[in-house]
Every structure is written in C-alpha cells, then in structure tokens.
Amino acid sequence: EQAKELCAQRGVQLTPIRYQVLELVWDSHKAVKAYDLLDKIKPLQPAAKPATIYRALDFLLEQGLIHRIESLNAFVGCRHSGHPHEQLMLICKQCHEVEERPAPEVMRVLGDETVQARFSVHSRAIEIHGICAKCAVLADL
C-alpha cells in the first residue's frame, strides 16, 4: 500500500504488472533475478515477456522501491523507499539474503574521497559478500 501511495503522490502509475513484480521481489526476501520473476509472473500474465519484466524493474528502480544488486544481476526490495539514499548491502553467499544497512559515516568518507578526486558519482551502493548470522549458526551445527 505504501508503494501505491508513493506512486500516486508522484503522479506515476503503479500498473498491475509493476505491482506484481514488486510483490514478487518483496516476497522473495532474497535477491531475485529478472528471469526468475518472469517464470513466476507467467502463470498470472501469460503474455509477459522479458521486456515486460525489465520495464517494470526499471520503473521500480526509478521510483526507489527496489535496489539492483550489481554483483548478482538481481533485485531486492528497498526498506527505505520514498526518499533517495545510499546503501550498504550485506549479501549472504550461502542463502543469498540481502540486508540493507544505513552507513552514513562510510558514505560521508566516500563522498569526501570522491570530491577530492574530482570524480563525478552517478550512484553509490556498497555490496559486501559474506555469511549471514543464520547461516553461520547452521554451519556450526
């Protein structure tokens, strides 16, 4: 519902296919690939094609409702949708869950470094791969 309200405030349309893709991304609780989304959408939207999914994903990215995990070529729901922000993504190599964390001090330092380097930043996201606490506990059993 928050996504619908946000889109209405911005004057953009959260179409049924966009909403279905958003729900699937959120329901997965893990990074999900576009073709996996297509497989899940097909029973609901038999005419859906890869371009359908990519257009929906592009819209959701533009609206800040999801994030792209570059290293996995996959997508996760944004926990802080509604306003632009930088994120630190902790990605579990075992279960593929992604935790979005605020990291204001890290981002401040990175900002200072890029200014000193006269580097024009287009987007900032840090992806860190490792083992989450749940998987670490399971490994110890």
Where are these regions (language model features)?
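Short, Lys/Arg-enriched N-terminal segment that forms or immediately precedes the first helix
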Residues: 1-11
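Short capping segments at the starts of secondary-structure elements
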Residues: 14, 27-33
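Pre-recognition alpha-helix immediately N-terminal to the DNA-recognition helix
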Residues: 19-24
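A short acidic, leucine-rich amphipathic alpha-helix
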Residues: 36-42, 53
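Basic amphipathic alpha-helical segments that dock to polyanions
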Residues: 53-63
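Non-DNA-binding regulatory cores of transcription-related proteins
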Residues: 62-141
